[in-house]
């Protein structure tokens, strides 16, 4: 390039009006959930939005029956009573669905993120098509006790989660080894079967959402979720948003070689998944077919070696997640962690790393929350133009 030649500036990504509208709605909903009861004046201050925008969103929420106004008692005897806004818990409900190869877990959730009902359906050990699973979920949906919900028509959305790589915007499961699926359009199948709007998320990101809600961690608190069990995966929120990556593959780490160019056994999958641990234990004791068998054998040197290897690689990935994300909390979850929790506490670096709740409960709760947030945003969009 010559001295007189001017380098053209790189293009700047401009956020369109649709993005601004979505961001404003999400901001108002987050403040309502975290700070209620809250006045309109406080909403303007906390969101840094204009009074006009706040009024439009709030009026839409009131018209939809999702929030209500209440008078607060003034701190002093003089002065007008402030009008506060509160979330109406029974204004809307969502259903969460978690699909695994051997069972379906569902829940019903109100607008206060309270699980009011849950159910589990065992499955035969065989391959199920998406249509078959959607039909079974419809049966579970229709069999839920009607008296638990103020009005059955208030169930407005379904969140579906499964293990694997998913593309939420396309409603498609790109690949799920556990379910035996590849390029499956799951959202359309469930919507046609049950007749409600459907949102899709993978299991690790659903668990992250569910765990944060259960622990009262607000959206702006950076958090990472490390799943270890049927697979190995990571999900993280950064500045209030779930990290997804270029092709929605953020956190898919189980097949990444620990040493580049080395054989398959150097991937995290070989050292941290439940199936791999059981396979290694069975090579010493063929009667072992679950993790409990390995735990009962910890008085033997080979079992101690398997556990030591597991802890070494778990510590490695925890440090990697901490170094890359530097989150406020790292939550360990998955099917293996609760079973091995007593034996891994010595490798947890500090109080920021905690043991998660039940993996399936967190996942189905997160799926319901994803659907709840999605449908409320859609309902508001129908009511207003910002």
Regions inferred by a protein language model and the residue ranges of each:
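Short glycine-aspartate micro-motif
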Residues: 84, 94-98, 155-159, 223-227, ...
